[in-house]
């Protein structure tokens, strides 16, 4: 006799724990209904998932990290991020010296000092690599296959107010695609600050403080917590996202706007929120976060559903189950049919709502071409 349950409800999986194999590395995952065992991904399940998703949403990670061993690359990336975070930690409870890049776009001395510290680490280890920093722009040899995308203080406004949603983000691309990433998130609050380190390598998984992480298993928008962000230009793209914010607030458990893209994407990878989207992020905002999500089992695309690269002007990341209804739910139908469990497929998912809104912007002539790609940098995008 088969079991019937609604998509996104994990309780029946607990009754299968005696017959299904669970991971010894990360055996439990937080879900709003409690902690549940995490299924180990068998080769057959992975093949089914990859075949269903690869054509629709190609992977963003680099197929190779190049001649540098992944272990060496990620150690330098983590060292660079931690070095920048030390600068931020020393300043976090002190008065801020604030200037403005725009009417509301802040920059502090801490941004600049953090970036300088990160650059010193990168140059010491790879003096021939190209660097793209939020504050310093393009530095180095454009003939290099490696491009470091550095946000020395993602969420500067939050930092300036002592609001706990900011981070140091370091991602390195190999021929334009993410190869390794580290994000140091600041948690806690005034007088009790702490950090946690997210890291990922292409094909090597995603980790938080050394423990492997994965995206959530929720596949109904109605049961999701979502995150978005808004840029500084109040134009058509901004107004469109306000409408999306309102719409998803009505149909989900809530939509948050925290103001730090790298943090938001790490939270998707950690499985505490299900999706994040935003228009007009820069490469340094996204290079680390998108790799974190993908290596945690999530999906990355543009907001129109197209193939994503870090020089794009829109991004949608999710746990994969919420990205679009057809391909992902077909995977679950196949998988759960093998388990003799009848599966209820939910209503339309994120791209069914975000995609058409983005297409309207394109039809209005809003520019979605690639940007901030260093001139002459060789990228397979």
Where is each model-derived feature located?
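An extended, acidic
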Residues: 3-4, 213-381
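Solvent-exposed alpha-helices and their adjacent loops that cap or buttress functional pockets
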Residues: 99, 140-142, 161, 190-192, ...
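Acidic active-site catalytic centers that drive phospho-/nucleotidyl reactions
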Residues: 111, 115, 134-135, 151-154, ...
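N-terminal subdomain of lithium-sensitive/metallo-dependent phosphomonoesterases centered on the IMPase/IPPase/PAP
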Residues: 2-153, 355, 359-362, 367, ...
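DPxDG-like acidic metal-binding loop motif
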Residues: 142-203, 207
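Residue-level signal for inorganic ion chemistry
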Residues: 84, 88, 111, 122, ...
């Amino acid at each position: 006799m088969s079991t019937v349950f609604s998509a996104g409800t994990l309780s029946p999986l607990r009754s299968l724990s005696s017959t299904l194999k669970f991971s010894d590395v990360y055996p439990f995952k937080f879900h709003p209904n409690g902690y549940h065992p995490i299924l180990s991904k068998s080769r057959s399940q992975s093949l089914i998932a990859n075949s269903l998703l690869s054509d629709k949403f190609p992977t963003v990670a680099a197929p190779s990290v190049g001649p540098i061993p992944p272990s060496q690359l990620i150690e330098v990336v983590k060292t660079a991020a931690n070095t920048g975070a030390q600068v931020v930690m020393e300043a976090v409870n002190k008065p801020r010296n604030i200037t403005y890049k725009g009417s509301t776009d802040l920059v502090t001395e801490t941004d600049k000092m953090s970036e300088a510290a990160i650059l010193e680490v990168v140059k010491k280890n790879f003096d021939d690599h190209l660097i793209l920093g939020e504050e310093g722009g393009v530095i180095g040899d454009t003939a290099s296959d490696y491009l470091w995308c550095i946000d020395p203080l993602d969420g500067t406004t939050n930092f300036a107010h002592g609001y706990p949603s900011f981070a140091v983000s370091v991602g390195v691309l190999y021929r334009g695609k993410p190869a390794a990433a580290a994000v140091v998130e600041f948690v806690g609050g005034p007088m009790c600050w702490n950090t946690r380190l997210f890291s990922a390598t292409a094909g090597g998984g995603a980790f938080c403080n050394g423990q492997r992480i994965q995206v959530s298993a929720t596949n109904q928008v109605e049961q999701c917590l979502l995150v978005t962000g808004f840029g500084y230009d109040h134009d058509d793209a901004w107004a469109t996202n306000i409408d999306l914010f309102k719409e998803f607030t009505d149909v989900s458990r809530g939509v948050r706007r925290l103001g730090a893209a790298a943090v938001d994407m790490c939270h998707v990878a950690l499985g505490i929120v299900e999706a994040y989207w935003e228009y007009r992020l820069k490469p340094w905002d996204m290079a680390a976060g998108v790799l974190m999500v993908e290596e945690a089992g999530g999906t990355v695309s543009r907001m129109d559903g197209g193939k994503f690269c870090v020089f794009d002007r829109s991004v949608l990341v999710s746990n994969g189950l919420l990205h679009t209804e057809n391909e992902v739910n077909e995977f679950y139908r196949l998988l759960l049919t093998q388990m003799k469990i009848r599966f209820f497929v939910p209503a339309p998912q994120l791209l069914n709502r975000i995609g058409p809104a983005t297409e309207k912007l394109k039809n209005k002539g809003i520019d979605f071409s690639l940007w901030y790609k260093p001139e002459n940098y060789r990228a397979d995008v």
